[in-house]
Amino acid sequence: ASKRGGSKAAKSATGEKAVARKVSSLTLEQKVAQMFFPRPEALTGMGQVTAAGDTTRKAFANIPVGGMCYFSQNLQSESQARQMLSASNQISLDEVGLPLFMSVDEEGGTVSRVGGNKGFSVENVGNMRDVGDTGDARRAYDVCKKIAGYLVPLGFNLDFAPDADIVNGTSQTMAKRSFGTTADVVAPMVESAVKGFLDGGIMCCAKHFPGIGGAQGDSETEAIATDKTLDQLRQEELVPFERAIATGVPMVMVGHISCPKVTGDSAPASLSRAIVTDVLRGELGFDGIIITDSLGMGAVAGLHKARDLAVAAIRAGVDMLLMTPELTDSYQGVLDAVRDGTITEERIDESVTRIVRAKLAL
């Protein structure tokens, strides 16, 4: 498959030279740290982070992470959020000469950290299911451009949205968050959503690959699975992701759903080379950033020790590790794995090249 997706950065010869130069200027420790995407509390060891000062700077110097994911408890007002994000980004620029991915889960409706938050004069745009039910894909474009319009001035450069999941089972987890119940409805909505975010000047992330909308249960607390074959997934679940990739989505989040009829085992997609490397990178030709869903979720938490979880995800082919439990130990675990040859430095460089390419385009 031809390589598609990834940053809008023209992969010109000069652009790629700048990316390669930047990657080679980083130490192994810095490169591995760029693959981690914690909450600010996990980086700093504090109970609640609402500013970025000396504590953040010291913690970042120790582990210069590639991104931070913010939640409602971090966001009290527009001026506070702007200051915190601007200071956080400056720390990253000072330490590694790269901006920080600063993300939020702003899907609209039930999953919103800014819209409807009492500290912000921003209305919640509502659930994506209501948008999908209109049958008008322009609505998805308008809503996502509107979300970008209030996130960008605060300093966010990445939204963990849109949901490309199809609700084709009895799962309540995605019932309101997804655009609908068939690929015919969801795919054009996802395409328009991605365009809306990108035109609004923010990176976005299609999730939760290869689609968690039909699974029983909630991966937040428990293991979930699908008994579909790869052919069945190709007909429905994968279609919105293919459309997102064709539209230039810069990032895809892999969910914690087991696909035993595809992989032959019970490993969740986020830790499965068959799903991440063979299907998403290989068959779908996605060359942007692949990030895991939160590695603190119940679906994966009990499978490995924290450090082994991070190593397993990288070996599956992911580029970034979201909300890894025990950040310091996980980081050290990946460094140890590179030093003992379990993971090659070339493998780390592949991921960091994708991260740097996207960051230099911000």
Language-model features and meaning:
Residues 1-61, 282-283, 302-362:
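Preference for extracellular/luminal or secreted protein segments
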Residues 30, 39, 72, 89-92, ...:
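Sec/Tat-exported extracytoplasmic proteins
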Residues 41-43, 47-49, 58-188, 208, ...:
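Enzymes and membrane/adaptor proteins characterized by extended Gly/Ser/Thr/Asp/Glu-rich
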Residues 189-210, 229-249:
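Phosphate/pyrophosphate-binding betaalpha-module
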